[in-house]
Amino acid sequence: MSVQPETMPDSSNKTNPTVKEVIAYLADKFPLCFSIEGEAKPLKVGLSQDLAEALADDEKVSKTLLRQVLRSYTMSWRYLACCKANAQRIGLQGENVGIVDEAQAEHAAQSLAVAKEAYAARKAEQRKEQRKDFFKKKAREERNAKTMNKAVKKGSPKKDTFAKATAESLAVLTHKFSKGNK
Protein backbone atom coordinates (compact mmCIF):
# COMPACT_ATOMS: atom_id res chain seq x y z
CA MET A 1 0.00 0.00 0.00
CA SER A 2 1.47 3.37 -1.00
CA VAL A 3 1.15 6.10 1.60
CA GLN A 4 1.39 9.78 0.80
CA PRO A 5 3.97 11.65 2.94
CA GLU A 6 1.52 13.84 4.83
CA THR A 7 -1.44 11.50 5.08
CA MET A 8 -2.19 8.47 7.16
CA PRO A 9 -3.83 5.52 5.42
CA ASP A 10 -7.60 5.61 5.73
CA SER A 11 -8.71 2.76 7.97
CA SER A 12 -12.47 3.11 7.71
CA ASN A 13 -12.52 6.51 9.44
CA LYS A 14 -10.88 5.28 12.64
CA THR A 15 -9.72 8.02 14.94
CA ASN A 16 -6.71 6.01 16.13
CA PRO A 17 -4.48 4.54 13.44
CA THR A 18 -3.12 1.04 13.96
CA VAL A 19 0.53 0.31 14.70
CA LYS A 20 0.99 -1.04 11.16
CA GLU A 21 -0.51 2.10 9.67
CA VAL A 22 1.83 4.31 11.70
CA ILE A 23 4.85 2.20 10.74
CA ALA A 24 3.83 2.61 7.08
CA TYR A 25 3.50 6.35 7.69
CA LEU A 26 6.94 6.53 9.31
CA ALA A 27 8.49 4.43 6.51
CA ASP A 28 7.07 6.89 4.01
CA LYS A 29 8.08 9.98 5.98
CA PHE A 30 11.54 8.65 6.98
CA PRO A 31 12.41 6.06 4.30
CA LEU A 32 16.12 5.96 5.19
CA CYS A 33 15.28 5.02 8.77
CA PHE A 34 12.18 2.80 8.71
CA SER A 35 11.24 0.06 6.29
CA ILE A 36 8.19 -2.13 5.88
CA GLU A 37 9.84 -4.88 3.85
CA GLY A 38 13.31 -6.27 3.46
CA GLU A 39 16.13 -5.87 5.91
CA ALA A 40 15.62 -3.46 8.80
CA LYS A 41 18.43 -1.26 10.12
CA PRO A 42 19.37 -0.80 13.78
CA LEU A 43 17.99 2.50 15.02
CA LYS A 44 19.77 5.18 16.99
CA VAL A 45 19.55 4.84 20.76
CA GLY A 46 17.15 7.60 21.85
CA LEU A 47 15.48 7.84 18.44
CA SER A 48 12.10 8.15 20.13
CA GLN A 49 12.99 11.66 21.34
CA ASP A 50 14.13 12.71 17.85
CA LEU A 51 10.97 11.22 16.39
CA ALA A 52 8.75 12.99 18.93
CA GLU A 53 10.41 16.32 18.09
CA ALA A 54 10.16 15.74 14.34
CA LEU A 55 6.46 14.88 14.64
CA ALA A 56 5.57 17.39 17.37
CA ASP A 57 3.23 19.33 15.05
CA ASP A 58 1.75 16.16 13.56
CA GLU A 59 -1.73 15.62 15.00
CA LYS A 60 -1.98 12.14 13.50
CA VAL A 61 0.54 10.51 15.85
CA SER A 62 0.72 10.99 19.62
CA LYS A 63 3.81 10.38 21.75
CA THR A 64 2.12 7.39 23.36
CA LEU A 65 1.36 5.88 19.97
CA LEU A 66 4.94 6.56 18.84
CA ARG A 67 6.26 4.66 21.86
CA GLN A 68 3.96 1.73 21.05
CA VAL A 69 5.01 1.78 17.40
CA LEU A 70 8.73 1.90 18.23
CA ARG A 71 8.30 -0.95 20.72
CA SER A 72 6.50 -3.02 18.08
CA TYR A 73 9.06 -2.18 15.38
CA THR A 74 12.10 -2.89 17.54
CA MET A 75 10.64 -6.17 18.87
CA SER A 76 9.91 -7.51 15.39
CA TRP A 77 11.93 -10.53 14.28
CA ARG A 78 13.15 -8.57 11.28
CA TYR A 79 14.59 -5.80 13.47
CA LEU A 80 16.04 -8.12 16.12
CA ALA A 81 17.77 -10.16 13.41
CA CYS A 82 19.53 -7.06 12.04
CA CYS A 83 20.99 -6.07 15.43
CA LYS A 84 24.37 -7.77 15.05
CA ALA A 85 27.54 -6.67 16.81
CA ASN A 86 29.25 -3.69 15.11
CA ALA A 87 26.26 -3.01 12.82
CA GLN A 88 25.73 0.70 12.08
CA ARG A 89 22.89 2.43 13.91
CA ILE A 90 21.05 5.09 11.92
CA GLY A 91 19.17 8.28 12.70
CA LEU A 92 15.94 9.62 11.21
CA GLN A 93 17.61 10.82 8.00
CA GLY A 94 19.65 7.63 7.53
CA GLU A 95 22.86 9.08 8.98
CA ASN A 96 25.23 6.74 10.86
CA VAL A 97 25.11 7.60 14.56
CA GLY A 98 26.82 4.68 16.28
CA ILE A 99 27.21 0.95 16.32
CA VAL A 100 25.50 -1.99 17.99
CA ASP A 101 27.78 -3.19 20.79
CA GLU A 102 28.23 -6.82 21.91
CA ALA A 103 25.81 -6.54 24.85
CA GLN A 104 23.08 -5.03 22.66
CA ALA A 105 23.61 -7.69 19.99
CA GLU A 106 23.43 -10.45 22.61
CA HIS A 107 20.24 -8.95 24.07
CA ALA A 108 18.67 -8.79 20.59
CA ALA A 109 19.66 -12.40 19.88
CA GLN A 110 18.18 -13.55 23.19
CA SER A 111 14.98 -11.58 22.59
CA LEU A 112 14.68 -13.11 19.13
CA ALA A 113 15.23 -16.62 20.49
CA VAL A 114 12.60 -16.09 23.22
CA ALA A 115 10.11 -14.70 20.69
CA LYS A 116 10.64 -17.61 18.30
CA GLU A 117 10.36 -20.10 21.16
CA ALA A 118 7.08 -18.54 22.34
CA TYR A 119 5.76 -18.59 18.77
CA ALA A 120 6.72 -22.25 18.37
CA ALA A 121 5.03 -23.10 21.68
CA ARG A 122 1.81 -21.32 20.61
CA LYS A 123 1.85 -23.11 17.26
CA ALA A 124 2.45 -26.48 18.95
CA GLU A 125 -0.47 -25.82 21.31
CA GLN A 126 -2.70 -24.89 18.36
CA ARG A 127 -1.69 -28.08 16.52
CA LYS A 128 -2.36 -30.08 19.69
CA GLU A 129 -5.85 -28.56 19.99
CA GLN A 130 -6.55 -29.18 16.30
CA ARG A 131 -5.48 -32.83 16.62
CA LYS A 132 -7.61 -33.19 19.75
CA ASP A 133 -10.64 -31.72 17.99
CA PHE A 134 -10.01 -33.88 14.92
CA PHE A 135 -9.88 -37.10 16.92
CA LYS A 136 -12.92 -36.12 19.00
CA LYS A 137 -14.86 -35.52 15.79
CA LYS A 138 -13.62 -38.78 14.29
CA ALA A 139 -14.60 -40.74 17.43
CA ARG A 140 -18.05 -39.10 17.42
CA GLU A 141 -18.54 -40.01 13.75
CA GLU A 142 -17.47 -43.61 14.45
CA ARG A 143 -19.91 -43.85 17.38
CA ASN A 144 -22.70 -42.48 15.22
CA ALA A 145 -21.83 -44.93 12.44
CA LYS A 146 -21.90 -47.85 14.91
CA THR A 147 -25.27 -46.72 16.26
CA MET A 148 -26.66 -46.45 12.74
CA ASN A 149 -25.29 -49.90 11.85
CA LYS A 150 -26.94 -51.45 14.92
CA ALA A 151 -30.25 -49.83 14.04
CA VAL A 152 -30.05 -51.09 10.46
CA LYS A 153 -29.18 -54.66 11.58
CA LYS A 154 -32.15 -54.83 13.95
CA GLY A 155 -34.53 -53.73 11.23
CA SER A 156 -34.84 -50.17 12.48
CA PRO A 157 -37.27 -50.84 15.35
CA LYS A 158 -37.19 -47.22 16.42
CA LYS A 159 -38.67 -46.07 13.12
CA ASP A 160 -41.46 -48.70 13.29
CA THR A 161 -42.20 -47.81 16.93
CA PHE A 162 -42.43 -44.16 16.08
CA ALA A 163 -44.64 -44.84 13.08
CA LYS A 164 -47.02 -47.09 15.09
CA ALA A 165 -47.19 -44.62 17.94
CA THR A 166 -47.98 -41.84 15.53
CA ALA A 167 -50.68 -43.86 13.71
CA GLU A 168 -52.25 -45.01 17.00
CA SER A 169 -52.14 -41.51 18.40
CA LEU A 170 -53.83 -40.13 15.32
CA ALA A 171 -56.54 -42.81 15.47
CA VAL A 172 -57.27 -42.02 19.13
CA LEU A 173 -57.31 -38.30 18.49
CA THR A 174 -59.54 -38.68 15.44
CA HIS A 175 -61.98 -40.88 17.38
CA LYS A 176 -61.96 -38.52 20.37
CA PHE A 177 -62.63 -35.38 18.36
CA SER A 178 -65.07 -36.96 15.94
CA LYS A 179 -67.42 -37.92 18.83
CA GLY A 180 -67.43 -34.41 20.19
CA ASN A 181 -68.23 -32.83 16.81
CA LYS A 182 -71.22 -35.09 15.98
UniProtKB/Swiss-Prot annotation:
GO cellular component: cytosol
InterPro entries: ProQ, ProQ/FinO, ProQ/FinO_sf
Region (Disordered), start-end ranges: 125-160
Subcellular location: Cytoplasm
One of the record's GO molecular function terms: RNA strand annealing activity
One Pfam short name: ProQ
Chief localisation class: cytoplasm
Function: RNA chaperone with significant RNA binding, RNA strand exchange and RNA duplexing activities.
PANTHER family xref list: RNA CHAPERONE PROQ
Protein family according to the UniProt entry: Belongs to the ProQ family.
Listed name of the protein: RNA chaperone ProQ
Biological classification of the source: Bacteria, Pseudomonadati, Pseudomonadota, Gammaproteobacteria, Pasteurellales
